[in-house]
Amino acid sequence: MPQRPARLAGYSVFAAMLASAGLPIYIHAPKFYLDEYGLGLTALAGVLFVLRLFDLVQDPILGWLAQVARTWRRPMVGGAVLLLAASMIGLFAVTPPIAPIWWFALTLTGLFSSFSLLTICFYAQGVMKAKAASGGHLQLASWREAGSLIGISVAAVAPVALAALTDQPFALFALLFALLGGVALWAMRGEWTGGAVQTASVSPLLVLSDPMTRRLLVLALVNAAPVAVTSTLFLFFVESRL
C-alpha cells in the first residue's frame, strides 16, 4: 500500500534539516572562524582532521547504540536534535567563552556527534518505514532526497541572503536552523518506532572483522575524502584566486 504524501513529508523536512547542518561544518565554519577570530588555516585543518578521525571511531559505536537502544529512539533523537541545534548556535551565534580554537573544536564535536547519530537513526527508521508498504523504498527515497537537495541548497546561499537583513548573518542562520530542528522533530513525531525490528545486536568490532565490510569502508573513505577537502577549501579558493 503506497504511503500518503503527508506521512512522507516529515522525512523530507528531517532530511532537509540534516543536509543544512552538514554544509556549514565544512564550508562556512572554517571561513567564519578565520575571518572573525583570525584562526590560521593550519590550526583549523588540524582540528577538522582530528575530529574526522574521532568521527571514524565513534560512528560504529553510535550505530551500535542506535540498535541496542532502539526502544528509546524517540527521546534519543530528541536529545540529539537539541545538541545539534545548541552546537550550531554555539558555533556561529555565541562569542567563544574560551580560546576560539577550543570553542571551534568543542562545538564541532557536538555537531559531528549529533549529526552522525541522527543520520543513523533517520536512515534506520526509513528502512523500517519502507518495508511497511509496497514500493515504499522508492517513494520514501524520493521524498528524502528531495528534502536533502533543498536543505543543502538553502544552507549554501542562506548566509549571503541573510547578510541583507543583518550584520550577523551566521548568527541568524544558526537561530533559524534551531527553529528548523524543532519543525523537523514535530514533522517526524509519530515515526520513531524503533522497537519494531527484532534483530540481534552486533558489536562494532565484530562488524569490522568482516573483510568485505572493511573493503567497503575503505571505498567509502576514498569516495568521501575528496568531497570533504574540496568543500572546506572552496571558499578560500574563490576568495584568493577568483
Q: What residue ranges belong to the model's regions?
A:
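Membrane-embedded alpha-helical bundles of multi-pass transporters/translocases
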Residues: 1-242
